Amino acid sequence: SRWWKDLDFVTTLPYARDRAVECYFWTMGVYAEPQYSQARVMLAKTIAMISIVDDTFDAYGIVKEFEVYTDAIQRWDISQIDRLPEYMKISYKALLDLYDDYEKELSKDGRSDVVHYAKERMKEIVRNYFIEAKWFIEGYMPSVSEYLSNALATSTYYLLTTTSYLGMKSATKEHFEWLATNPKILEANATLCRVVDDIATYEVEKGRGQIATGIECYMRDYGVSTEVAMEKFQEMAEIAWKDVNEEILRPTPVSAEILTRILNLARIIDVTYKHNQDGYTHPEKFKPHIIALLVDSIEI
């Protein structure tokens, strides 16, 4: 999109993933209906932006820099930019500008106030990224329970689910309040995303010296092999799927339209991490799906 090209992160932040097309493909799995075009664009931009933030924590910086970056995002004030090193200034300004754009866009329908909920989720995930970065830099390995309590947020699904409602005119403040309580279906979805991601990315993270991974934490806590830990995480994914389906079928205070976004976010995980491979980080795995959906015509 023009927005992504204008940011030019490919040049200014060469460590970051360039995944604009993959981000939009992801959102097509969340809502394919034409009336959700605004929602798709907002969600795609957020996925692209959180990838930049995630890659910043993964690939760059020292604890002190991450601490200042995290604090600046909690304060959410452009005046904080002067505290940051140059490479962090780029993503910080882009992040604040993006949410300003959301507020301006939603103000046309009198809904700018709901952007607050998405901002709070962004602040939350950044706090949790900071914890993970400290673990990595300091060589700390948490217990698997401590790991998961932090890693559910860094799955991105608290943030992305909240963001998925921004462009839906039917999503009211009450829906955002409900989501902010972390209902069971959201917890299950975040768990699903987390453990499936951990299985798919284990070898890559191990190769770059990451010891505080879910699989490694489970292996140490229970004295088991990699294969057993992977099987346990797969079992956790299956339980999470059952919880998602159960919550979809039972009476809830929100409509099917609202719940379907959560269900579809779960479904797209199956595509992204098909055969335990990370299709987002390695887009060649995604390419056949993208071509089939957005390029090839349907034969009649």
UniProtKB/Swiss-Prot annotation:
Q: Which Gene3D superfamilies match?
A: Farnesyl Diphosphate Synthase
Q: Which UniProt keywords apply?
A: Cytoplasm, Lyase, Magnesium, Metal-binding
User: What the protein does?
Assistant: Sesquiterpene synthase that catalyzes the formation of vetispiradiene from trans,trans-farnesyl diphosphate. The initial internal cyclization produces the monocyclic intermediate germacrene A.
Which class of enzymes does this protein belong to? Answer: lyase
| Domain of life according to the entry | Eukaryota
Protein residues bound to Mg(2+) 2? D54, D58
Q: Name one Pfam family in it.
A: Terpene_synth_C
Q: What is known of its domains?
A: The Asp-Asp-Xaa-Xaa-Asp/Glu (DDXXD/E) motif is important for the catalytic activity, presumably through binding to Mg(2+).
Question: Which cysteine-cysteine pairs are annotated as disulfide bonds in the entry?
Answer: none
Show the InterPro entries listed in the entry: Isoprenoid_synthase_dom_sf, Terpene_cyclase-like_1_C, Terpene_synthase-like, Terpene_synthase_metal-bd
What is the name listed in the Swiss-Prot or TrEMBL entry for this protein?
Answer: Vetispiradiene synthase 2
The annotation note on the cofactor reads: Binds 3 Mg(2+) ions per subunit.
Q: Where does Mg(2+) 3 bind?
A: D197, T201, E205
Q: Which cofactor does it need?
A: Mg(2+)
What SUPFAM superfamilies has UniProt attached to this entry?
Terpenoid synthases
Binding-site positions, Mg(2+) 1: D54, D58
- Stated EC number for the protein is 4.2.3.21
Briefly describe its induction. By elicitor from R.solani.
Enumerate the subcellular locations listed in this protein's record, separating them with semicolons.
Answer: Cytoplasm
